Swiss-Prot record:
GO biological process, one term: cell division
Domain of life: Bacteria
SUPFAM superfamilies: Cell division protein MinE topological specificity domain (SSF55229)
Protein name (Swiss-Prot/TrEMBL): Cell division topological specificity factor
Gene: minE
Length: 88
């Protein structure tokens, strides 16, 4: 029976395996290319400036860059400031 299973098994051909691997690589590249190289430094610089005036948790600052219609880039900055009572 094992001999029959060996000949009847349907293995993926190498072209399909290569195609799947290439799709994974392309998807990873798109994710990494979506964020410009300067964005982490920009986030750090913005956080440093905010911390000069208000003591906040670094996790309370989010910086995102969105691409719209190819040529338009939108920089979104969200800062959650502490309540007035927490500042005292």
């Amino acid at each position: 029976m094992a001999l029959l299973d060996f000949f009847l098994s349907r293995k993926k051909n190498t072209a399909n395996i290569a195609k799947e691997r290439l799709q994974i690589i392309v998807a990873e590249r798109r994710r990494s290319d979506a964020e410009p190289h300067y964005l982490p430094q920009l986030r750090k610089d913005i956080l440093d400036v905010i911390c000069k005036y208000v003591q906040i948790d670094p996790e309370m600052v989010t910086v995102q860059l969105e691409q719209k219609d190819g040529d338009i880039s939108i920089l979104e900055l969200n800062v959650t400031l502490p309540e007035a009572e927490e500042l005292k």
